[in-house]
Amino acid sequence: MKNSIFLIPFFFLVIGCSPVERSVGFTTWSDDGTELKYHLGTEASISVVKKFDQLLQEKNYTELNQIFSDTAQFIYHNGVRNSLNEFINLNIRRDSSLAANNETLKWEPQNVFSVDLDPSSGGEHVNMMYLATYESPETKSQFYANLWLYVLNGKIVRVNQYNQSIEN
């Protein structure tokens, strides 16, 4: 009887301490159009995206291969798609043009979060918002860059980027 008395509170303690997996909202991003809910993602995927930002800030394009899948795609607001090599070449040309014209383009991360649509299958959607500042000898402008990155097994598979002008 004594054992039963001690087991009952222990049982409730174990049940009461079990984490409840929360999910909210909906999306039809699944392969077959099935409606899924959002779950919190992980710091591991956010760390991959922060590494991406760090490498871009440092203009260290050679190490990007370490955090991107072999089939990675970059998709822009106008539907243009680039491979990783095309993305790197685009950045090198941009950097050269900016330097030649005494211009700068700097960006600061504003927020980042990760959501998981199906925790049983792997892969997370990470959102990172930047405030970008372009400066030339004659002008200064800012815009927001909103990136959605799909991270699977520690590698970035896809980057979708949308920009929003900031009116002065």
Region locations from a protein language model:
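Surface-exposed, charged secondary-structure patches
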Residues: N91-P137
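Solvent-exposed loop/turn segments connecting transmembrane beta-strands
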Residues: N78-V80, E138-S141
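Hydrophobic pocket/interface hotspot
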Residues: F52, E63-N65, A72, F87, ...
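Bacterial Sec-dependent N-terminal signal peptides
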Residues: M1-W29
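Hydrophobic/aromatic beta-strand elements that line small-molecule binding cavities or substrate pockets
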Residues: F87, N91, P109-F113, A145-Y150, ...
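Short beta-strand edge/turn micro-motifs at domain boundaries
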Residues: S18-V24, Q142-N168
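A short gly/proline-enriched turn/hairpin at secondary-structure junctions
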Residues: E35, Q73-S83
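Short, low-complexity N-terminal intrinsically disordered segments enriched in polar/charged residues
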Residues: S18-E58, T62, Q66
